[in-house]
Curated annotation (Swiss-Prot):
It holds the Pfam family Rubredoxin. Signal peptide: none annotated. Belongs to the rubredoxin family. Rubredoxin is a small nonheme, iron protein lacking acid-labile sulfide. Its single Fe, chelated to 4 Cys, functions as an electron acceptor and may also stabilize the conformation of the molecule. It comes from Methanocaldococcus jannaschii (strain ATCC 43067 / DSM 2661 / JAL-1 / JCM 10045 / NBRC 100440). This is Probable Rubredoxin-1. GO terms for biological process: alkane catabolic process. GO terms for molecular function: electron transfer activity; iron ion binding. Fe cation binds at C24, C27, C57, C60. The lineage of its organism: Archaea, Methanobacteriati, Methanobacteriota, Methanomada group, Methanococci.
Length: 80
């Protein structure tokens, strides 16, 4: 499940969906969904929640996976 944060105004218009950045608790590397992870063929605009279960931290390499990442209070928007 992808966690979205959407803000809507009283007139019914809404802002673009926003996606969280995640930080490795071991090395501090930050996954930015706007950039993806080219080292593992993860394209830009891939939310963290949609990364495959086999994805690993590109800095720690094989030592830690998604379970070692924590959500940050930093969000990015995807342009259509």
């Amino acid at each position: 499940m992808v966690e979205l944060k959407i803000a809507c105004k009283l007139d019914g218009s809404c802002e673009k969906p926003r996606y969280r950045k995640y930080k490795c608790k071991v090395c501090g590397w930050v996954y930015d969904p706007l950039k993806g992870d080219p080292s593992q063929n993860i394209p830009p605009k891939t939310p963290f929640e949609e990364l495959p279960d086999t994805w690993i931290c590109p800095v720690c390499r094989g030592k830690v996976g998604k379970e070692s990442f924590e959500p940050l209070d930093e969000w990015v928007e995807f342009d259509e």
